[in-house]
């Protein structure tokens, strides 16, 4: 009834009803894309439910049938120009009326599109608008061939009349067209037009009639306004206005495509694989999906595909997730291979018997029941995947071997490739040894095996037989090992061939193994396939690849069998097969020898080279290959250690098209530092693209001329030797390649210079990999041979020769063979560094030996000789007159190579070379030796001096044959004594002073005994002492032919008190004890704080002591006629700079009233400082006096001896406990605590909003904070901090752009309460700021320097403050913050306009803003290297965020700057600095009292008085004041700390507060406390009771001395120069793990402006090294301060460095570069020497008792502490 009313009154409820029905027609769970002509029934299922609820009777709602309806025939006209459908005739109004078209009319008010003017369009009647439900066409359209009569007679036979159809909704936008089309297609289907809707291929089931065409046309234009159609639809309709079907066809096609894409993505995202299906099927499925997406222009990367696949793996495949988790370069093919590998392994492991063959090559797994059957299978993950291109047969998984074994050559089995075969056994067979033929115990069902047949097995990679009756050419097996699945050995007795003679006369042979321990004779289909024979299980035959039938196969049980009648029996002897032990390899060269001789090349290259005959006179069979593939060379592991492989495929493909020597790759390596000038520091390498031939050329520099000469040489060489022209040279973009000179060179010769792109080193892979390979070889060869580093290029040269001669794994020929050259002659090669004896054809005397020991390097380029290094001459020679030194394995003995004897092998390999001592040599005259035998290949000289330690390793002694750790000290008979003294055996020089420090004498105060075991040595030492003169100069003349050779420091040691002792050298290689009193360490090891109270009585003692001043301005090292001036860097002004001028005005202890020789009086004023080595972090506080050191901390070192090596030798040979590293077992918690100190967060000193206001019970304080809060809000609004015009919804903004904000409250030093609105920059997203921007503030040293200069120059000091400084800087990024709490807008956001405090970029923005203003508006310039220090001709400004300190000689100049600043910023004058009376400042926490022209005092008394009582530390508990911050002799207990977690956190928090405050005080001005603060700061995370007590004592001392100030006085008279001095000191090994404490104090014109105390970053091995480390740390800051002083004050500057280490001064002064080359600290010492000489730095000695830097490195007694600090802080 309801439907009738709707039909009768179409205008009623039109809008609402239609809307409600439409909303029900689109189910939420329906896929909107799954619509096409083929699946419309499913899509329409839900909508029909809606229509069915409003069905009406045919008489009231259905369209009445028109029995007079006649459908016209389609016109026979050509098809339209767009589309395959026939052109329909136009519909006339009469036809439309005759077809009841009035039902489909539309209101006239609808806008008429231009295609409505078509003749086929009939304008609807305005009195009958389109109803809500449209009746469908009464009949379906007939086939075109039907006549009108047929249609009119049986209209109901063609279609079923449907009820009213729900019309589609009107198209509302262009974007919704695809969705609208789906509803429109459903509408047409419901209108009985589904069979004319084209599918995605444009195909339709029948042609439409005119009436149907008009119906579609009119409904389409009625519900799809033209202006809302997509562009592609408009284009179709503009060409043919009625071509609606083309639109529908393309729409369906698009929907199908989108639908398939979605299905593919869903399938790819939901991939699952557990091995239930084959891996190949899974791979094909995934690849098909990816390929289909690729065809739709959707590329799925390998990484994404791998991630989706890995997500769905389960079962045994799940472990691949962890394997690929960290990989960034995942390959899909590699992942499929891994899956296939696991699938095959699981399939093999799950089968216990051969598979059951079925027709059509199908098979299934059938388990076996034989209990004792031996079924072999693969258990390794290196399973070889069968090539899918080959025909696959059914697998019987009873045997399989590794892929290497399956590839064995038919003619010969390479035993090294089959050393480990894995087999499986169901019952874990325990078989006999490999050489014994054991009898297996097995029970085989008679129905299970077919007698006299071979079981055909596709799973076995080798054929196995139980009887040797059919085995031809059998050889006993000695290497092949096969194990079952339980890894039990299964012996293989023999290997041989099976010969087949098939029925058609075809003969073939396959490899087979003989073992009696298997259940069946197994025939491998893999072996048959190698002979082009396959098994056809459809016809049960063996066939050739051409289809020829060879033999039938029989199916018996579950398996297929081949009769043994086709096997040809053999007559082999059992004795031959089982006699394995008697077959031994004889006269074979050991692989390690060949590995060494061929430059430590890898196994595959050597083996392949021998197979290809790339090395002559040596065959593959001549080498013992057992375990060669697994051999690990220690030198290779060390020398070739690398992080990862080079990225493959970086070379472009087109490079492969060049001919040999047309395309070169080149690269430069270097520099190699610390080499003599004659040694090359670089090399340039070239690689030919085609042949991979390599060249290397040495370079001493990278200048254009040097590079050009090399290119000229290589091009000429290639042109003349290979008749080729270089066309392209590939290089990187280094300046040595991109210069104009080389570019012009290439242009003139028509060579293309191919450069890599910017920062793309991977494109230069060929040259980069070559350099890496050569350097790996170089390091390996040098390490193996033990030769010095300056021979590094010889190692590179040797490696190049070898690499050119070997076959690489990727090539079939070596580079020499590619180039057409002969292979490498093995008889011309010696192992790199092989000891040899070279004939000396021109000896100094006829009675001198004619042989010189040397080391073979590489074959000569320019002759048939060999390049040999002669250590005695420091030269390399090109000669053929040498003989190999036997029984010497160079440095290999350290890796237990002693058991390898290669001498006989070397003799056989080099038998073709005749040495100069061969018998036939005697017939030649010695005059026939040409001069070229000793022509210098490279004049490499380390130094002409006879230095003591040219060879730090005992293996470098070419004649050292004894393998014991004790070296021989006598020169060998074969060497001239003169030569050995100067060049080859430095130990002979040591024999003159045969002394050694025994284990009790090092670190433990041992005694020294005279030599009684070596008379010769003893007499030498006695004579030397007897000839000792009374002056140092006489001693110098006695010790050397050339004074420069040895230097002063090699002759004597000078005690700090002025006494001189002979330079006591000792021979570490003789077990000699000797004794004397008060042993004195050498210069290198002298403690910087040692002073003797019991001087040794000697000839020169009194004279020296009497002339020693308090400040030693002329140290004993310089007391010679050649060293009268102690300054290090003499220049034009050095005459005016003396020690007195440097030491003048320094706040040093006043010791002038003490006699320098009266050491006992000195010790009265400066108490003993006990120091000992300890594991304590406060170590160095016990047992010995710093002024009375009678115990040697370390045995004296000889000249040029590497200290770190001495320490290792001592640990290994001397067993000295004092040098052992600290035991960490009992200190594990302490160590962890010390290491974790860096992660300590600062203690919060501010209050949150709830703490300051909401829950604050102090009403007065709360009111002050409220007032501060409103004041801050007002300031923020005044500065337009955020956009107040608009509030943003929190949900509409990207979360990472939202910055959390908060209010923080604190009380300032002046008592005012401060509130600040800040951003939470700690959780700010990295994308919201530029990490490269820097926030700078003035350095404290810059402030102290400026204050010091202001005092000396009577400057006015003005202090300013800029309110809300950060808010003056705009913000560039789009950021939002939450409104302040009082606004109550929790869900709203404000957009920031200014740089709010707390943002990461705010500091940098403010710095750039104020910097720009000061430079542009105030005419200031920032001092280079010192941020926030600005100056002009009159004013200096130090900027610290919003605080400004102005310094000027004229106060008006300061006022002028203030006036300019106030124009832009809210500037407050804190202190103008007027008047001549004392003015007090509070500058950055420092309380400064300043009176112009008189003094300046810096302290923190008020601040400390206020803050210290709030720390809850019991101050003055007993009323006793501490007079020093700490006392020597206190040690921190290292026992584990057992404490509750809550108590631990509480104590750590307390330590943070205490040490934080102490650090602030020490950093500002209390430099005397820095050592104690630094030590306790390392124990913040170890808050034991002892550590807390020591911290309390430090706080107590700060409280007791809170009134102390850093005192500066104006320099009077004013000097024309500024003097900048640093005083340095170090305390050796007094920190955990023998780390040293270093300290430096900086003084400007006598005023202490800064100090530093820290633990050395490196573990020093001697006192000298610690002092050098301290000095090297001080010089960079000294130079920076020098630059600052010169910028702020234009006076000349004198820079000085004071240290109490004479050995350090000696090192700085020395010009000998070789002395420290092999030392651990040699690099730092040589750099220090360069810095001193290059910066005009004056270095002087200062006595320890006057070194005020001592307070920075160790705890001192009260008197000493006061004496060193009372002049500069009191």
UniProtKB/Swiss-Prot annotation:
- Among its keywords, does the record have Transmembrane helix? no
> EC annotation?
3.4.23.-, 2.7.7.49, 2.7.7.7, 3.1.26.4
Q: What is this enzyme's catalytic activity, as reactions?
A: DNA(n) + a 2'-deoxyribonucleoside 5'-triphosphate = DNA(n+1) + diphosphate; Endonucleolytic cleavage to 5'-phosphomonoester
The residue ranges flagged as biased composition, category Polar residues, are 1-11, 19-39, 49-60, 366-390, 399-408, 415-435, 1009-1024, 1065-1082
Where it mainly occurs, coarsely classed, is cytoplasm
Question: Site annotation (Cleavage): which residues?
Answer: 397-398, 578-579, 1232-1233
Q: Where in the cell is it found?
A: Cytoplasm; Nucleus
Q: Where does Mg(2+) 2 bind?
A: 1361, 1442-1443
Q: Where is this region: Integrase-type zinc finger-like?
A: 579-636
User: What region holds the Reverse transcriptase Ty1/copia-type domain?
Assistant: 1353-1491
Domain of life according to the entry: Eukaryota
Q: Which GO terms describe its molecular function?
A: aspartic-type endopeptidase activity; ATP binding; DNA binding; DNA-directed DNA polymerase activity; RNA binding; RNA-directed DNA polymerase activity; RNA-DNA hybrid ribonuclease activity; zinc ion binding
Active site per database record: 457
An annotated GO cellular component of this protein is: nucleus
Q: Which residues bind Mg(2+) 3?
A: 1625, 1667, 1700
Q: Which Pfam families match?
A: Pol_BBD, rve, RVT_2, TYA
Q: Known post-translational modifications?
A: Initially, virus-like particles (VLPs) are composed of the structural unprocessed proteins Gag and Gag-Pol, and also contain the host initiator methionine tRNA (tRNA(i)-Met) which serves as a primer for minus-strand DNA synthesis, and a dimer of genomic Ty RNA. Processing of the polyproteins occurs within the particle and proceeds by an ordered pathway, called maturation.
The record, for InterPro entries, names: DNA/RNA_pol_sf, Integrase_cat-core, PolX-like_BBD, Retrotran_Ty1/copia-like, RNaseH-like_sf, RNaseH_sf, RVT_2, TYA
What range(s) does the RNase H Ty1/copia-type domain occupy?
Answer: 1625-1767
Segment RNA-binding: which positions? 295-397
Q: Where is this region: Disordered?
A: 1-89, 355-449, 1005-1038, 1057-1205
Tell me which residues bind Mg(2+) 1. 667, 732
Q: What does this protein do?
A: Capsid protein (CA) is the structural component of the virus-like particle (VLP), forming the shell that encapsulates the retrotransposons dimeric RNA genome. The particles are assembled from trimer-clustered units and there are holes in the capsid shells that allow for the diffusion of macromolecules. CA also has nucleocapsid-like chaperone activity, promoting primer tRNA(i)-Met annealing to the multipartite primer-binding site (PBS), dimerization of Ty2 RNA and initiation of reverse transcription.
Q: What is known of its domains?
A: The C-terminal RNA-binding region of CA is sufficient for all its nucleocapsid-like chaperone activities. Integrase core domain contains the D-x(n)-D-x(35)-E motif, named for the phylogenetically conserved glutamic acid and aspartic acid residues and the invariant 35 amino acid spacing between the second and third acidic residues. Each acidic residue of the D,D(35)E motif is independently essential for the 3'-processing and strand transfer activities of purified integrase protein.
Q: What else is known?
A: Retrotransposons are mobile genetic entities that are able to replicate via an RNA intermediate and a reverse transcription step. In contrast to retroviruses, retrotransposons are non-infectious, lack an envelope and remain intracellular. Ty2 retrotransposons belong to the copia elements (pseudoviridae).
**Would you tell me the protein name for this molecule?**
Transposon Ty2-DR3 Gag-Pol polyprotein
């Amino acid at each position: 009834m309801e439907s009738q009313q709707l039909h009768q009154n179409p205008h009623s409820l039109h809008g609402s009803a239609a809307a409600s029905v439409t909303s029900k027609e689109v189910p939420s769970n329906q896929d909107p894309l799954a619509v096409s002509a083929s699946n419309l029934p499913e899509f329409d299922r839900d909508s029909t439910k809606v229509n069915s609820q409003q069905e009406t009777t045919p008489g009231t709602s259905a369209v009445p049938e028109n029995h007079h309806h006649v459908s016209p025939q389609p016109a026979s006209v050509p098809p339209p120009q767009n589309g395959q459908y026939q052109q329909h005739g136009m519909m006339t109004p009469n036809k439309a009326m005759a077809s009841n078209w009035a039902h489909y009319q539309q209101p006239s008010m609808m806008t008429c599109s231009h295609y409505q003017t078509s003749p086929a369009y009939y304008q609807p009647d305005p009195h009958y608008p389109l109803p809500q439900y449209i009746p469908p066409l009464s009949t379906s359209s007939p086939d075109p061939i039907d006549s009108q009569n047929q249609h009119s007679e049986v209209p109901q036979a063609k279609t079923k009349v449907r009820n009213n159809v729900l019309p589609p909704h009107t198209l509302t936008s262009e974007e919704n067209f695809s969705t609208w089309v789906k509803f429109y297609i459903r509408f047409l289907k419901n209108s009985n037009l589904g069979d004319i809707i084209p599918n995605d291929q444009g195909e339709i089931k029948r042609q439409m009639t005119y009436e149907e065409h008009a119906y579609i046309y009119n409904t389409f234009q009625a519900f799809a306004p033209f202006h809302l159609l997509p562009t592609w639809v408009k284009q179709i309709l503009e060409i043919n206005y009625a071509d609606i079907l083309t639109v529908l066809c393309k729409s369906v096609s698009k929907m199908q495509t989108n639908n398939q894409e979605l299905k593919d993505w869903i399938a790819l995202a939901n991939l699952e694989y557990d091995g239930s299906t084959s891996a190949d099927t899974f791979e094909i499925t995934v690849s098909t999906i990816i390929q289909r997406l690729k065809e739709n222009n959707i590329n799925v990367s390998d990484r994404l595909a791998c991630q989706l696949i890995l997500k769905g793996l389960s079962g045994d495949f799940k472990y691949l997730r962890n394997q690929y988790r960290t990989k960034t370069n995942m390959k899909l093919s590699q992942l499929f291979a891994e899956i296939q590998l696991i699938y095959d392994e699981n399939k093999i492991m799950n089968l216990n018997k051969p598979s059951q063959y079925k027709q059509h090559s199908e098979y299934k797994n059938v388990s076996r029941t034989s209990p004792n059957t031996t079924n072999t299978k693969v258990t390794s993950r290196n399973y070889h995947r069968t090539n899918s291109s080959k025909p696959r047969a059914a697998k019987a998984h009873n045997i399989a071997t590794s892929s290497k074994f399956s590839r064995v050559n038919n003619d010969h089995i390479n035993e090294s490739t089959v050393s480990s075969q894995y087999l499986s056994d169901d019952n874990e067979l325990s078989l006999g040894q490999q050489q014994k033929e054991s009898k297996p115990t097995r029970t085989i069902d008679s129905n299970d095996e077919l007698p006299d047949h071979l079981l055909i097995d596709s799973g076995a990679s080798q054929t196995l037989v139980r009887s040797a009756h059919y085995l031809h050419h059998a050889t006993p097996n000695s290497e092949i090992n096969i194990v079952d699945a339980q890894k039990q050995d299964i012996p293989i007795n023999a290997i041989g061939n099976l010969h087949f003679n098939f029925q058609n006369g075809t003969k073939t042979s396959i490899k087979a193994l003989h073992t009696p321990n298997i259940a069946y004779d197994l025939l491998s289909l893999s072996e048959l396939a190698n002979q082009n024979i396959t098994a056809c299980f459809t016809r049960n035959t063996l066939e050739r690849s051409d289809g020829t039938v060879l033999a039938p196969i029989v199916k018996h049980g579950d398996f297929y069998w081949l009769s043994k009648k086709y096997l040809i029996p053999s007559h082999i002897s059992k004795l031959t097969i089982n006699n394995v032990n008697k077959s031994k390899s004889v006269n074979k060269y050991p692989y390690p020898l060949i590995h060494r001789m061929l430059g430590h090349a890898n196994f595959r290259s050597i083996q392949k080279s021998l197979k290809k005959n790339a090395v002559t006179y040596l065959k593959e069979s001549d080498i013992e290959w057992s375990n060669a593939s697994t051999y690990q060379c220690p030198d290779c592991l060390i020398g070739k250690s690398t992080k990862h492989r080079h990225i493959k495929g970086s070379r472009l493909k087109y490079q492969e098209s060049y001919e040999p020597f047309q395309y070169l790759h080149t690269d430069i390596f270097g520099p190699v530092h610390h080499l003599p000038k004659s040694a090359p520091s670089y090399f340039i390498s070239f690689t030919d693209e085609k042949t991979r031939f390599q060249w290397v050329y040495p370079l001493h520099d990278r200048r254009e001329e040097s590079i050009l000469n090399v290119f000229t040489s290589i091009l000429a060489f290639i042109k003349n030797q290979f008749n080729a022209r270089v066309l392209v040279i590939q290089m990187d973009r280094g300046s040595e390649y991109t210069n104009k000179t080389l570019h012009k060179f290439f242009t003139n010769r028509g060579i293309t210079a191919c450069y890599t792109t910017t920062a793309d080193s991977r494109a230069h892979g060929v040259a980069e990999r070559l350099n890496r390979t050569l350097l790996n070889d170089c390091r390996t060869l040098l390490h193996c041979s033990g030769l010095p580093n300056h021979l590094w290029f010889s190692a590179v040269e040797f490696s190049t020769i070898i690499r050119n001669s070997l076959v690489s794994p990727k090539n079939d020929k070596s580079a020499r063979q590619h180039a057409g050259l002969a292979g490498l002659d093995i008889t011309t090669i010696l192992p790199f560094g092989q000891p040899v004896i070279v004939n000396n054809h021109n000896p100094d005397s006829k009675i001198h030996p004619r042989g010189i020991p040397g080391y073979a390097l590489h074959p000569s380029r320019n002759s048939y000789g060999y390049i040999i290094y002669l250590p005695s001459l420091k030269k390399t020679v090109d000669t053929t007159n040498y003989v190999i030194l036997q029984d010497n394995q160079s440095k290999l003995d350290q890796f237990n190579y002693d058991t390898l004897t290669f001498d006989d092998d070397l003799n056989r390999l080099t038998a073709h070379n005749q040495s100069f001592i061969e018998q036939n040599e005697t017939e030649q005259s010695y005059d026939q030796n040409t001069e070229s035998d000793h022509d210098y290949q490279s004049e490499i000289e380390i130094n002409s001096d006879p230095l003591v330690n040219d060879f730090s390793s005992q293996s470098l002694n070419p004649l050292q044959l004894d393998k014991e750790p004790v070296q021989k000290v006598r020169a060998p008979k074969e060497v001239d004594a003169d030569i050995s003294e100067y060049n080859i055996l430095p130990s002979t020089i040591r024999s003159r002073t045969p002394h050694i420090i025994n284990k009790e004498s090092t670190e433990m105060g041992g005694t020294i005994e005279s030599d009684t075991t070596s008379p010769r040595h003893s007499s030498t030492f006695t004579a030397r002492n007897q000839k000792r003169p009374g002056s140092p100069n006489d001693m110098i003349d006695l010790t050397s032919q050339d004074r420069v050779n040895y230097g002063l420091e090699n002759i004597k040691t000078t005690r700090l008190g002025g006494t001189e002792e002979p330079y006591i050298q000792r021979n570490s290689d003789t077990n000699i004890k000797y004794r004397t009193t008060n042993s004195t360490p050498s210069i290198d090891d002298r403690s910087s704080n040692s002073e003797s109270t019991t001087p040794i009585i000697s000839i020169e003692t009194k004279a020296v002591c009497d002339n020693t001043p308090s400040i030693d301005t002329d140290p004993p090292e310089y007391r010679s006629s050649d060293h009268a001036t102690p300054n290090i860097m003499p220049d034009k002004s050095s005459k005016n700079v003396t020690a007195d001028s440097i030491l003048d005005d320094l706040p040093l202890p006043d010791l002038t009233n003490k006699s320098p020789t009266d050491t006992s009086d000195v010790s009265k004023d400066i108490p003993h400082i006990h120091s000992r080595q300890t594991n304590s972090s406060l170590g160095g506080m016990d047992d010995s006096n710093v002024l009375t050191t009678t115990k040697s901390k370390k045995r004296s070192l000889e000249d040029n001896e590497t200290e770190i090596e001495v320490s290792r030798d001592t640990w290994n040979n001397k067993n000295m406990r004092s040098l052992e590293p600290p035991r960490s077992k009992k200190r594990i918690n302490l160590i962890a605590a010390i290491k974790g100190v860096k992660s300590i967060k600062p203690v919060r000193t501010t209050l949150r909003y709830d703490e300051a206001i909401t829950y604050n019970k102090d009403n007065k304080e709360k009111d002050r904070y409220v007032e501060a809060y409103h004041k801050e809000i007002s300031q923020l609004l005044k500065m337009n901090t955020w956009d107040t015009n608009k509030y943003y919804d929190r949900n509409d903004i990207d979360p990472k752009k939202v910055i959390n904000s908060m209010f923080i409250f604190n009380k300032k030093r002046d008592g005012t309460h401060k509130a600040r609105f800040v951003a939470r920059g700690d959780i700010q997203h990295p994308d919201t700021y530029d990490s490269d921007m820097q926030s700078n503030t003035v350095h404290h040293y810059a402030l102290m320097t400026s204050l010091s200069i202001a005092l000396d120059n009577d400057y006015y000091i003005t202090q300013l403050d800029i309110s809300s400084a950060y808010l003056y800087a705009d913000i560039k990024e789009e950021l939002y913050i939450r409104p302040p709490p009082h606004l109550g807008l929790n869900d709203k956001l404000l957009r920031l306009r200014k740089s709010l405090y707390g943002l990461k970029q705010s500091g940098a923005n403010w710095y750039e803003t104020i910097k720009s203003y000061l430079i542009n508006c105030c005419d200031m310039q920032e001092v280079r290297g010192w941020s926030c220090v600005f100056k002009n001709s009159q004013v200096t400004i130090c900027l610290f965020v919003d605080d400004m300190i102005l310094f000027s000689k004229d106060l008006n100049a300061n006022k002028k700057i203030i006036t300019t600043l106030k124009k832009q910023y809210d500037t407050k004058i804190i202190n103008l600095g007027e008047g001549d009376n004392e003015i007090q400042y509070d500058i950055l926490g420092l309380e400064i009292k300043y009176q112009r022209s008189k003094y300046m005092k810096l302290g923190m008394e008020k601040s400390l008085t206020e803050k210290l009582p709030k720390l809850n530390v019991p101050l003055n508990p007993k009323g006793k004041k501490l007079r020093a911050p700490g006392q020597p002799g206190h040690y921190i207990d290292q026992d584990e700390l057992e404490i509750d977690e809550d108590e631990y956190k509480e104590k750590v928090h307390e330590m943070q507060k205490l040490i934080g405050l102490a650090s602030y005080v020490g950093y500002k001005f209390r430099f005397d406390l820095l050592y104690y603060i630094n030590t306790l700061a390392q124990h913040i995370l170890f808050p034991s009771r002892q550590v807390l007590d020591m911290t309390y004592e430090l706080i107590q001392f700060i409280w007791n001395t809170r009134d102390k100030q850093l005192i500066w006085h104006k320099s009077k008279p004013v000097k024309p120069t500024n003097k900048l001095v640093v005083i340095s000191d170090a305390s050796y090994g007094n920190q955990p793990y023998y780390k040293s404490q270093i300290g430096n104090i900086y003084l400007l014109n006598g005023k202490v402006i800064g100090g530093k105390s820290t633990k050395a970053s490196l573990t020093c091995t001697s006192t000298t090294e610690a002092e050098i480390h301290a000095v090297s740390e001080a010089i960079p800051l000294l130079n920076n301060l020098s630059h600052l002083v010169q910028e702020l004050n234009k006076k000349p500057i004198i820079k000085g460095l004071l240290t109490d280490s004479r050995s350090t001064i000696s090192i700085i002064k020395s010009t000998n570069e070789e002395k420290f080359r092999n030392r651990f600290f040699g690099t730092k010492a040589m750099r220090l020497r360069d810095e001193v000489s290059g910066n005009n730095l004056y270095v002087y000695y200062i006595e320890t008792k006057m070194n005020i830097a001592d307070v920075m490195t160790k705890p001192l007694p009260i008197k000493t502490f006061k004496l060193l600090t009372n002049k500069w802080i009191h």
